[in-house]
Every structure is written in structure tokens, then in C-alpha cells.
């Protein structure tokens, strides 16, 4: 009830202004009596993935809390884990505004944010300041002005800094809003990046006496051959997980709608089937050698169950959370318990 009132108010505002207000409000109310407005108790539904025991299989996808400002509030809502970021070595403003658009009729969002964030050092301070023990994954990317050929250096810089505080680290090479980034999903560039990440992981594991898993986040706009190639690279480089999928460049399901032709990545309900298909194909190629975190168009408990049936070990939500509110977390956890 409270969320539906807040949503009604927020949906009258510009999408990015509403997002920023929500994060500020959650940051202010977290760990205070005001958190009772959105906190909820969930049944325990532990899942072991990447060598980590998650209290439940429902996580917050990267992009909502880029700078890790409201982590404790999301813990109160019942998320099993939170993924912050995408964060880059240097702060960057991102693309010009407006750059975030609701397509309410389709329960969808288009964004062309462009990795706007306050930089990795700021994120580390926020990770140090969190008061709860919620598991936090950190999604890392490259700065816009870093050439693709040197992109791996940005990932290694971020990895170095977040490693002591992250439950796992996600390498994001699949945002459509950083020029050239998706070219890193293929061939020699991908293998070079994955090998560099694994070498850095080994170095940091020895330094901190702690193994932090690494995951790769991929796009939905891939052919079966490209998915197979990525799967083989993940296996050969012994990556710990893959996150499928990021936003899509397709506009199927939003044709003719207001904002439907805006540039950027489309998320939400129109992505549901495509994302689930990528998970299914990945699962067949990976043959349970590497776990899959499913994300993309989860707007109901059934959507989440479909992701699990396709081969996902965990799921993440973002657009569905915006449209449904915290109740969707409980609905998914309860549905998983009943399976």
C-alpha cells in the first residue's frame, strides 16, 4: 500500500529525478525507525552459488544503486543480495539528459545513462560504511574515454579497490550505452580480458587470504554461436559465474509507444522471453560447470520460476522492482519455497 502511494507520486516526476529522490530517501531512512515503511521479514531460502551461501535467491540488479548509497535499505526489504555499480575508476557524468524513460504501459524502462557514477573510491567508502551484513556484489566497468583496447586496465583498477569489500565482482562488458563496450564480448578481446581478471583474482586472493568470485555480465542481443563462444571462454578461463542478461537494443513489444524509439537499452517485461532464452542456451553450453544469475524482465514470481527452470541459480530484479515494489521479492521467495 505504502509503495503504491509512493509510486503514484514518483511516476508523476521525471524518471531520473524520481530515481535520485528514491535513493536519497532510502539512504536517509535506512537503519532508522522509518525503515519500517518498507522492511519485511522473509522466509529463509538459502542457496549456495559461487561458493557463497545466499539467504535467498533474489538479488537487486546493478544500476539502481550505482554508488552503493542505500545498501542497508535494500537489506531491510529482504533482498538476498545487492549488486551495486556499474562503477568506473574515475567519476563520470554519463550521457546527456534526459536519459531514463518509463514505458509504463509495457512495464519497461529505456536507459542510456552511460555509466554515470561517482567513481570507485566513493563506492569503497560506502561499502565500508554499510551497517548490515548483506552480501554485496560490485559491478565494474570502463570509463568512456578509455580506449576499448586498454579497457581491461580499468577493470583491474576497480577490482583492486573493491576486492576486500565485495562478495563477488561482476565484469560488465554488455552495456549498450558505452561506445564499443560490447565488442569486448567476442574473440581475443574477451579471452584477454577474462585471463587478466583471473590473474588479478589469484593475486588478490593471495594478498587478502580470501577468494572473491568473478562473474561476467552479457547482453541478450547475441546469436547462439556467440553465446556458445562466450560459454567456452568462461569455462576455459574458469570464471565463477555469468549474469544473463543486460538490457536489449531490440524494441519488440514497445512499438508505437511514447519513448519507444528512444536510444538506449530496454529493460522490463518486453525483455522477459529473450533473456530466458539466452539463459536456456547458456545452460546447455555450460552444462552446470558455471552457475548462471538470471536477470531481465522478471515482473512476477512466475517469471522468476521460468528463469530457474531455464537454468538460473539466482535471479536479480530491477524494472520489475520499480513497477511492483518490494512485494515482488517476497512473492518470488515464497514461490521458490513452494516448488
UniProtKB/Swiss-Prot annotation:
<feature type="binding site">
    <location>
        <position position="177"/>
    </location>
    <ligand>
        <name>substrate</name>
    </ligand>
</feature>
<dbReference type="InterPro" id="IPR005719">
    <property type="entry name" value="Dihydroorotate_DH_2"/>
</dbReference>
<keyword id="KW-1003">Cell membrane</keyword>
<dbReference type="GO" id="GO:0006207">
    <property type="term" value="P:'de novo' pyrimidine nucleobase biosynthetic process"/>
</dbReference>
<keyword id="KW-0472">Membrane</keyword>
<feature type="binding site">
    <location>
        <begin position="318"/>
        <end position="319"/>
    </location>
    <ligand>
        <name>FMN</name>
    </ligand>
</feature>
<comment type="pathway">
    <text>Pyrimidine metabolism; UMP biosynthesis via de novo pathway; orotate from (S)-dihydroorotate (quinone route): step 1/1.</text>
</comment>
<dbReference type="GO" id="GO:0044205">
    <property type="term" value="P:'de novo' UMP biosynthetic process"/>
</dbReference>
<keyword id="KW-0665">Pyrimidine biosynthesis</keyword>
<dbReference type="GO" id="GO:0106430">
    <property type="term" value="F:dihydroorotate dehydrogenase (quinone) activity"/>
</dbReference>
<comment type="function">
    <text>Catalyzes the conversion of dihydroorotate to orotate with quinone as electron acceptor.</text>
</comment>
<feature type="binding site">
    <location>
        <position position="297"/>
    </location>
    <ligand>
        <name>FMN</name>
    </ligand>
</feature>
<feature type="binding site">
    <location>
        <position position="245"/>
    </location>
    <ligand>
        <name>FMN</name>
    </ligand>
</feature>
<feature type="binding site">
    <location>
        <position position="86"/>
    </location>
    <ligand>
        <name>FMN</name>
    </ligand>
</feature>
<feature type="binding site">
    <location>
        <position position="268"/>
    </location>
    <ligand>
        <name>FMN</name>
    </ligand>
</feature>
<dbReference type="GO" id="GO:0005886">
    <property type="term" value="C:plasma membrane"/>
</dbReference>
<feature type="binding site">
    <location>
        <position position="172"/>
    </location>
    <ligand>
        <name>substrate</name>
    </ligand>
</feature>
<feature type="binding site">
    <location>
        <begin position="62"/>
        <end position="66"/>
    </location>
    <ligand>
        <name>FMN</name>
    </ligand>
</feature>
<feature type="active site" description="Nucleophile">
    <location>
        <position position="175"/>
    </location>
</feature>
<dbReference type="GO" id="GO:0005737">
    <property type="term" value="C:cytoplasm"/>
</dbReference>
<dbReference type="InterPro" id="IPR050074">
    <property type="entry name" value="DHO_dehydrogenase"/>
</dbReference>
<dbReference type="InterPro" id="IPR001295">
    <property type="entry name" value="Dihydroorotate_DH_CS"/>
</dbReference>
<comment type="similarity">
    <text>Belongs to the dihydroorotate dehydrogenase family. Type 2 subfamily.</text>
</comment>
<dbReference type="InterPro" id="IPR005720">
    <property type="entry name" value="Dihydroorotate_DH_cat"/>
</dbReference>
<dbReference type="InterPro" id="IPR013785">
    <property type="entry name" value="Aldolase_TIM"/>
</dbReference>
<dbReference type="InterPro" id="IPR012135">
    <property type="entry name" value="Dihydroorotate_DH_1_2"/>
</dbReference>
<protein>
    <recommendedName>
        <fullName>Dihydroorotate dehydrogenase (quinone)</fullName>
        <ecNumber>1.3.5.2</ecNumber>
    </recommendedName>
</protein>
<keyword id="KW-0288">FMN</keyword>
<keyword id="KW-0560">Oxidoreductase</keyword>
<keyword id="KW-0285">Flavoprotein</keyword>
<feature type="binding site">
    <location>
        <begin position="111"/>
        <end position="115"/>
    </location>
    <ligand>
        <name>substrate</name>
    </ligand>
</feature>
<feature type="binding site">
    <location>
        <position position="217"/>
    </location>
    <ligand>
        <name>FMN</name>
    </ligand>
</feature>
<feature type="binding site">
    <location>
        <position position="66"/>
    </location>
    <ligand>
        <name>substrate</name>
    </ligand>
</feature>
<dbReference type="Pfam" id="PF01180">
    <property type="entry name" value="DHO_dh"/>
</dbReference>
<feature type="binding site">
    <location>
        <begin position="246"/>
        <end position="247"/>
    </location>
    <ligand>
        <name>substrate</name>
    </ligand>
</feature>
<comment type="subunit">
    <text>Monomer.</text>
</comment>
<feature type="binding site">
    <location>
        <position position="139"/>
    </location>
    <ligand>
        <name>FMN</name>
    </ligand>
</feature>
<feature type="binding site">
    <location>
        <position position="172"/>
    </location>
    <ligand>
        <name>FMN</name>
    </ligand>
</feature>
